[in-house]
Structures are given as structure tokens and as C-alpha cells.
Amino acid sequence: MANTYLLEVGVEEMPAHVVTPSIKQLHERVAKYLKEQRITFDDIQEFATPRRMALLIHGLSDKQPDIDESVKGPAKKIAQDADGNWTKAAIGFTRGQGASVEDIEFKEVKGVEYVFVEKHIAGKTVAEVLQGLPAVITSMTFPTLMKWGYNNLQFIRPIRWLVSLLNDEVVPFNILDVEAGRETQGHRFLGHPVEIAKADDYEETLNNDFVIADQTKRKNLIKDQITKIINENNWQVDWDEDLLEEVNNLVEWPTAFAGSFDEKYLALPDPVLITSMKDNQRFFCVRDGDGNLLSHFISVRNGNTDYLDNVIKGNERVLVPRLEDAQFFYQEDQKLTIDEYVERLKKVSFHDKISSMYDKMQRVAVIANVLGKQLNLSDEELADLDRAAHIYKFDLTTQMVGEFAELQGIMGEIYAKLFGEKDDVATAIREHYMPISAEGELPQTKIGAVLAIADKLDSIMSFFAVDMIPSGSNDPYALRRQAFGIVRIIADRGWHLPLLSIQSEIAPAFENAEINVSFDLNKNSDEVRSFFLDRIKQLFHGQKVRHDIIDAATDTRQNDIANILEAIQTIDDHKDDDNFKEDIEALTRVLRIAKKDKRPVSELVVDPNLFENPSEAKMHTAVSELIKENQQTVSENFAALRTLTPIISEYFDENMIMDKNEDIRNNRLAQLSILAHQASLIGNLDNLIVK
């Protein structure tokens, strides 16, 4: 028969951010355990609140399947002596299998006879298997762990109760001194201890005791309650999914309500108001029909509507000091100038092994100028970029950012506009942090994008220069994310920047700007190059591009990230062409033979007087034309190279490359090396797998 099993782990209240990952982890571990134990099931339903993680497993089999196996033992010549008596080896083997020598059979394996015992292993009942779950539960990992009592067990929070029900029967086990049973706990304040009659009654039983255990149903209820409030008041709400998820994991019985605050606080910038309400109080902001913030908020309590007026007043009361602080910071911050804030950055450390934040800005200003000129920015754009680069961290020393660190960059833009900076300069101050995650929004302005690249590039080069290079999962300064951000910006903009060799250009620029750097920015340049190539691979692995295509295009002498990105995309776009295999095989044959020529390409000269066959002249003309036309894009270069396939085939048919005559041999190698050099702009095509 199909069985239903309920497992509930009751704990002291977990932090909201670990509730969802924890139930997902428990689900995965229990499912893996059951599969390893050969127990089948239909599906697993998840339940989670701040005080519990629960799984309802449907369609469990009654027991493990029995196993009949033939167990191989020692060879016959070892199992029996010369007189045919059983040896200790045979007796020991059968004893270990729970059998006797009378059960022995001989079977031939590759011409040698071996002892075999047919063994029947009866499957355990599902209840017996489920008694092994304590080891699964206690093996869970969490960002932070707690100990309690006089034991060594560590868990996210102390375990206070366990429910283990197979249909309507308790499956007994314990974790420390907590015995599994059928008693669960209702809502902390509205509920009470309650027994669950059978596993399928779990959700309804808790619902009757003021606990909505299903996360999705609880979240939908919160959304419905908030929607009702905003519809009644003709408001709009900022549906912040992260905030909704957090609130959902803070409550077991949600009740949404609206509160208000003094309209004078609406004079604060929207991001300040939103942060004060969202991050500190977990309030949802509301707006009028035109999108303007209103002096109201929506919150969610963990309880019912009893004494709701008192709850509303309490929430309104605790918000006032937050808004008062924000108003004070906002007013005080405007009493100083940007230059005064910049001066304070001399006492703010970027990193104690590298420099102050002020010195970082000086470096970034130089890097930004180098990048801006390479991108042919106008004089006005270069001036705006230079101004932004010299002040873009100033808000770090304001009181507002000191209190609300998440507003860095945002307050920089707001204050910069208040102090009269140009809009492009102010926007760049905010955008230089972008993207703030792997999928985060990219800078929308040209100045912001260049500043974002310059800032991240300085961080990467600086940390590499002092040998603080990410390894394994260790990346405390998020250098991988910053490098990935640079790659994404370049991909988005299509900018051609020789970033993989930029270090050699920056050091002289520092000297010209009379900026002293206490470390060698050229140090570990090869590692920096590899670091960026790995981020390019990461980008295209995420897009499910074939590994061999990525490996081919990143095994290159290119320094221009945009060209490498284009090479990957170009090869991927044409991989299914009818003649793709033929073209790649022709080019890779050229690449392989050209490796025998150790001379620098810059020194190679092809002498037409040494040609013996028409195909040599034809190859020479075709390659010369290809170089002369100097295709502007990687895709154009690749297309031009592919037109050479019949010429290459004819060339190899007519010519012995490694001719006995040294001059002829070197001339032919020179021809192939020059062509190989052109092909290497695409990448190492030899890495491609063609079928």
C-alpha cells in the first residue's frame, strides 16, 4: 500500500533568510536518503515557518525490495586443499555472508573457478528505514550554528520538538533528549500544543491552531491582504519580492495592516524613506496614482486582528525615531561641500595593504582617463568622467551612508545634484557600483559604465598586486563578481578595450599623473588575464554554449574582451552550418603544421620566386587579400577564413610542406604561419570538436 509520512522539526525561531534554504536542504537530504535506502515515493510536500521545517512524503513504499545476489568469494584452488577439504578462507567467507560451506557453488570467471554464495537479503520495512532520519537531520549545514545544553550537536537553532508519523503511527526516534511523537506546537501566542492524528491531517491541524505552514499559501494570503488594503485606499504598493519573502518567513499567522507617519518626512528623498521603512521595520511603502510616496505604510503582524489598533500605534511610534534620524542626517550632510567629504576619504581605508579610499579614487581617475580615450569619448565626456572619478566615493563619509550603508552611491547621486554637479556626473556616482549581482542592472550612461569598469579594474589589479588572489570558494572582496560585471558591461556596450593587456598602459599613466603607488600594478598580470578569461567562460557556460567552443575562443592571443565574446558567439552561430566541419578541419590542419615554424610572425617573408606549384601562388594571393582587407569584426574575419577551404585543400594536395629543400620548406611554413596567425585571432580552433 502507499503510505504518507510526516516529518516535522520544531526549533526556536530561525532568522528569516535561512527558512527557505533550510527546508530546501532538508527536502534534498531526505529524498537522497530514501533513494539510497531503495524506498520509493511519489512526491514530497514542503512546509516551513520560522519555528518549523516539515516534509509530507506521499506514496511511500511499504519496504525495501528484497535483494538476491550472487556473492563472489576466493578461487576454488584457495577454497579447497589438495584433498578437497574446505580451507579457512572458504569457511571464513561463508560465515561472513551468513551462510555455510554447504551453500557454496562454483562458477567460472574468465577461465578460473571461484566460490559463490547465493544470498537473499530481506528488505527493511519503511518504518525501520525512517528511524535513520536523525542522522540526516543532524547532518544539515547552516550559515551560523548554535549549541545548547551539555552536548556537541550544532544546529541552526535548538530543536524543541519532533513529529514522526507514518500514516497514523509514530515512528520513534530521538535527537538528544527530544523524542519524536505526534505532538506539534501551534502559534507561539495564539496556539497551544496539539496532537496530530495522522500524517495527512498536518496542514489542517496547524491551520486550526493559527499556523499556516505552507509558505506559498502564506505568501499569497499576505499579498491578498495587502491588495485589499491598497484597493480600499486607492493606493499603489512597491511590491518588493525580497521584502515579501522576508516577511513571509517571519510570521506563521499573517495579518496585514496600514499605518501612517507625519507628512513632513515626505521631504526626504524617496530612497531614504524606503530604506528607513523597509530595512529597519520591514514596512511596504505606498504611493498615490501618480507614483508619489504617501505618508502611509503597510506592515504584517504575526498574529490575528486582536488589539490591532495597539499594534498599529506601536509600529507608527517606532518608525518616528528612524525618520527623525534620517531627517537629521539629511540636513547635516548638506552643511559640508563635496570637496570636504573627499578630503575625509584620506582617513578611510580601502584596504590596509593597498591604500586609502582617497588614493583609490586618484588611481581610478587615471584608469578612467585611459579607458575614455581608448573609447574616443568627447572632450566634454572626458571632463565629466574625470570629475566623477575624482569624487565618486565622497558619500561614504556622509552621516546618511554611515547609518544606511545600502544607500552608498544612491546618496552620492542625490547629494551631487543638490551641490550642483552635472546630471551625468551625479548618475555615474550611483552607477559605478553596477552591476551589484551576477544578474544585476547594468549602467545606463556611458560615463557611468566607464567609471564602473575603472573602479572594478582598479580593485582587481590592486588585490592581485598584493597577492590577495581569490582561490577556491574564497573571494572575500567579491573580485569574481566585479570581473564578471566588467565582462557584462563590455558585452552590453560592445566596447573594444584591450583590458587583458591594460596593466602595461596604466603604470606609465600613473607616472605622468604623478600618482605614487606603493605596489606593482603589473604584478600577476598573467593571473589577471586568466581571471578575466574565466569570467568570460562563466558568462557563456550560463548561456549553455558548448565547452569546446568556449575553450577554443578563450585560448587566444586576443586582448580585446569584446573580440573574444564575438568569437564565441560567431562560432556558436555557425556550428551547425553544412560546411562547418570541412572549414574547421582545413584551418586546424594549417594551425598544427604552422606550430613547426618557430620564427616570429613579424619576421616572416614569403618569396613568390620559390613557388613550385600554382596552389602556392593562389594561397599567397588569397591570404594577402585577406590581410589587406583587414576585416573590421571577428565574424567578418571568420567568414573570410572559411572561404579559403578549397584553396587550403588544393595547397596540401599539391605541396609537400616539409620539403627537403630548406628554402622551399621555410617558405611554405611561412605561408601557413601567416595564415595561422590570422586564424588565431578567432582562437585556437584546434580545440573545437567537429563531427
Swiss-Prot record:
NCBIfam families in UniProt: glyS
Enzyme class: ligase
Enzyme Commission numbers on file: 6.1.1.14
Annotated GO CC locations: cytosol
Subunit structure: Tetramer of two alpha and two beta subunits.
Top-rank taxon: Bacteria
Cellular location(s): Cytoplasm
Keyword annotations: Aminoacyl-tRNA synthetase, ATP-binding, Cytoplasm, Ligase, Nucleotide-binding, Protein biosynthesis
Record HAMAP family: Gly_tRNA_synth_beta
UniProt record, GO biological process: arginyl-tRNA aminoacylation; glycyl-tRNA aminoacylation
Protein family according to the UniProt entry: Belongs to the class-II aminoacyl-tRNA synthetase family.
Organism: Limosilactobacillus reuteri (strain DSM 20016)
Protein name, entry field: Glycine--tRNA ligase beta subunit
